[in-house]
């Protein structure tokens, strides 16, 4: 398995070490800002209802929802070569996020995040 693309990164390190009772908002906000910036050029109409996002990702990847499971799945399949680092981080974020933070207004309903996920889901279909 080739983990080189997703190890040695502070976002991935954070996802792997996150405690159930705490969220480092500074790291998350920095991550979200990078994701939002990168998604600005995506199709404005490419949105998915927020409540379907996590369910759809887990369904397509057959995951148990754990971050370790996500990383293992990505690294042991063609996804490692098909997804960009941003898309990998996006996938990790939505599978590992905690509800209190995910549903925060301005984060959960941000359309640029939905566009990033829409693009990712299309790519997941063509990867497998």
Model-identified regions with their sequence ranges:
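Charged, low-complexity interaction regions
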Residues: 20-27, 41-48, 79-81, 100-111
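Long alpha-helical scaffold regions
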Residues: 8, 17-19, 27-36
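Repeat-associated, polar segments at repeat-unit boundaries in modular proteins
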Residues: 44, 48-65, 113-124
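Short, extreme N-terminal segment that most often corresponds to the first beta-strand
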Residues: 1-22
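Short amphipathic alpha-helical heptad-repeat segments
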Residues: 4, 80-99
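Intrinsically disordered, low-complexity coil/linker segments enriched for acidic/polar
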Residues: 9, 24-25, 84-87
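Amphipathic alpha-helical binding modules
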Residues: 93-128
């Amino acid at each position: 398995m080739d983990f080189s693309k997703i190890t040695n990164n502070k976002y991935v390190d954070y996802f792997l070490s996150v405690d159930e009772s705490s969220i480092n908002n500074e790291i998350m906000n920095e991550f979200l800002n990078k994701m939002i910036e990168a998604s600005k050029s995506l199709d404005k109409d490419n949105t998915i209802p927020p409540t379907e996002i996590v369910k759809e990702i887990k369904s397509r990847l057959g995951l148990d929802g754990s971050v370790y499971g996500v990383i293992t799945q990505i690294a042991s399949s063609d996804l490692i070569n098909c997804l960009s680092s941003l898309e990998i981080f996006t996938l990790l974020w939505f599978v590992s996020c905690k509800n209190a933070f995910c549903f925060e207004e301005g984060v959960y309903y941000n359309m640029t995040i939905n566009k990033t996920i829409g693009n990712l889901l299309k790519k997941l279909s063509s990867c497998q």
